[in-house]
Curated annotation (Swiss-Prot):
Keyword Magnesium: no
GO cellular component: a single term: cytoplasm
Every sHSP domain range: 63-170
Disordered: annotated span: 173-199
InterPro entries, per database record: A-crystallin/Hsp20_dom, Alpha-crystallin/sHSP_animal, HSP20-like_chaperone
Annotated organism of origin: Drosophila melanogaster (Fruit fly)
Phylogenetic classification of the source organism: Eukaryota, Metazoa, Ecdysozoa, Arthropoda, Hexapoda
PROSITE patterns, per database record: SHSP
CDD domains the UniProt entry points to: metazoan_ACD
Keywords: Stress response
Gene that encodes it: Hsp67Bc
Domain of life: Eukaryota
Record's protein name: Heat shock protein 67B3
One Pfam family this sequence matches: HSP20
């Protein structure tokens, strides 16, 4: 089924349906903007404005156009394998990142607690297969202040590509190179003064 033209027009920033109050209902925003939802925020805002009768219009959006952040997007940028996941509903201590059978596993879980809408408990698990060309020993995970978990994995570097490396300089004691011709160390000023004077 071809895309409906006016739906594409609604995706334009100049559309009359887009304003400064994309989410006029604060409760709607709280419930949907930070959940692991397969729809991007613009689509959710559009549904909020047009009502329940317009939900079928979303089916005409191609999968590649939906934002991946809410469900955890994996991509290869600047040669790295990257995962970005919105985990704003969890505290840092409620999140774990593990490598299991060459898969990056992200888990978030918190027990039942009270919020503005009642009591709620949450639990999710995301798995991202790590391609073999990336270094599983160099995985870096960071959590931003606004609740986005970022995982970066650099590519493997083959030994053939290592053309240059830094050799560390270690500090040691006096050198044995400064010796006289007989293989003995040259006498210092103190040793010369102790020798008997020639008659």
């Amino acid at each position: 089924m071809p895309d409906i033209p006016f739906v594409l027009n609604l995706d334009s920033p100049d559309s009359m349906y887009y304003g400064h109050d994309m989410f006029p209902n604060r409760m709607y925003r709280r419930l949907h903007s930070r959940q692991h939802h397969d729809l991007d925020l613009h689509t959710l805002g559009l549904i909020a404005r047009m009502g329940a009768h317009a939900h079928h219009l979303v089916a005409n959006k191609r999968n590649g156009e939906l934002a991946a952040l809410s469900r955890g997007g994996a991509s290869n940028k600047q040669g790295n394998f990257e995962v970005h996941l919105d985990v704003g509903l969890f505290q840092p201590g409620e999140l774990t990142v593990k490598l299991v059978n060459e898969c990056i596993v992200v888990e978030g879980k918190h027990e039942e607690r009270e919020d503005d809408h009642g009591h709620v408990s949450r639990h999710f698990v995301r798995r991202y297969p790590l391609p073999k060309e990336f270094d599983s020993d160099a995985i870096v995970s960071t959590l931003s202040e606004d609740g986005v978990l970022n995982i970066t994995v650099p590519p493997l570097v083959s030994k053939e590509e290592l053309k240059e490396r830094i050799i560390p300089i270690k500090h040691v004691g006096p050198s044995d190179l400064f010796q006289n011709g007989n293989g003995h160390k040259e006498a210092g000023p103190a040793a010369s003064a102790s020798e008997p004077e020639a008659k």
